[in-house]
Amino acid sequence: MHRRSFLYRTALVSIGSFLPFWTRAGSTEIPSWESLVDWARWAPSVHNLQAHRLKIVSETEAVLCYDPKFLLPVGDPNSDFNTAVMGVFTESLSIAAAHYGFAVRKTEIIGKLDHTMEEIMPFARIELVPAQRKEPLSRQLLKDRRTSRNNYDGKPLSALTLNACEDIVNAFEGQFFSSEDEDLIDYLIKINQESLFEDLNSQPMREELDGLFRYSKKEAETHRTGLWTKCMGFPGKLVKSVFRHHNRWVKGARKQMLKQYYRGTFSGTATVGWIQYPWTTNEDKFEFGRMLCRIWMQMANDDAYMHPFGNLITNPSAFEKMNNTLELNKESAAPLAFAFRAGYSKQPPRSFRIPTNKIILS
């Protein structure tokens, strides 16, 4: 097991104060918000629901909004993780803007994500400013990045990638850990599997997930939001049966078959990682999202994939087991905020996205 040191290794991932920098010598072109959203819309979001919306105020100012229809009253009742996604989307806009020598930054959080709202609501003000530094992450990574939920090839994540990810976390004042210990990996996969079946036993959770799964390419292409079962590595008919005929899968041979099938999608996992990060305020969660975006893009840059262990964070019993098992900095008040597996696999399918003109508000 490895705990990465608290050192900034290179300027590659420095997130410090900006000083003017132009990626194109002499360029004064201000990119349109539409052009930036066209790249940033490929950013990851919770269950691919894409709640983010953008209200343009001027060529350099906008209001980041959210559509409450795409929040999760059961799975994310306080919208903690969707708040983080607002940070992911903002950082994606910034990476896209770097192509023109600009960056996008949040100036003020003006609202709180609330699934009880009935209309699109504001969350934060953002602005387009001259970049302070050269952006090491290409905007093409926003489209190249994918989540691989399939089996990996058994190779541990490279030390260079782990070091780069640690530097990113350090720059955001978090703490990064990773492990290649086979027993620990097997244990995390085991409790992840247990938490899945525990969640499936909850009718409200089943109904919420059933409403966001897309069981065929036609459904996925029509909605352009939600979890396409092909991206989950499961046949659509199987997943639909599990959610809509749950009693058939709670015992006996079918339950064992489902367990083995799900376990098989984790084969070849040779690296797991986790992050301690402040998780009290909306600012904390937003900044976590910015950090997570950069980690994910770094993985894509290095031809690696990451698969978050979402259940291990949101399921209380699984979280307690994991929290009591993993190496953590006990002197830090920051909680365990994120866990994942990472490695190398065949290129997974890409989820659909809603078009730019649906994200930008009129």
Label each PLM-derived region with a short phrase:
Residues 2-362:
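Acidic, surface-exposed loops and disordered segments
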